[in-house]
Amino acid sequence: MKRMSEGMKETSQSNILLESGTNELEIVMYKVGGETFGINVLKVREIIQPLPVTKTPQHHQYVEGVFRLRQEVIPVVNLAKVLGYPPSPEPNQDKFIIGELNKVKVAFQVQSVSRIHRISWEQIEKPSELSQGSHIQTIGVIKLEDEIALLLDYERILMEISLK
């Protein structure tokens, strides 16, 4: 009986290893300014409808303000502003992607969230300097069957906001 449970433990551990060793990741796809972007699902806590935001004095231009979610005060970063796109045509239809990056909780305001894609690391290309342009926040180009999506450096975006 003891050996059987040990064997079962080994099997379940190897399944976990097999699953984590698949060279795949899941990406939440969203749109800002008509363009498609992605964020690793491991950085996402939840996706919610926008809640009322309280403006804060002397905040960074990319920060819309803060809101309270289950007793936590969370800042809202407007990704359209970060990326230089015009404001959302229908802000009531926007979504908040609640993320946790380096133990900092933040809401990224996006215009829509479409789905989660499971992709392999081989589908992500490093952007060329030419295609990256002034958006140094872009760290990857995700090649999907019918479109491409940009992978942003969310930690860098937060770092830029906190430095200014």
Residues covered by each model-derived region:
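An acidic, low-aromatic, low-complexity terminal/linker signal
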Residues: 1-164
